[in-house]
Amino acid sequence: MHFENINLKTKNIMRQTLRDRNQHVIGYIDVEFSGRQCLRDSNNHVLGYYEPGRNQTVDSNYHVIGNGNLLTTLL
């Protein structure tokens, strides 16, 4: 698993690149300093969020998907 530090508009974010079995990029998980995670597709469109304080995954429209971190099910 590879993480890289990126600075998006002065936010400290760790980015994990998600790849398929052929090493093609299928998405990214950005982990904010607060612990909140944002799932983006390979075109950088937001697909959903994991809110660790509530232990819930929500889609890009903030509809609850379920309890726990279910981000990769949105890919």
List the predicted regions and their residue ranges.
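Intrinsically disordered, low-complexity proline/glycine-rich segments
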Residues: 1-75
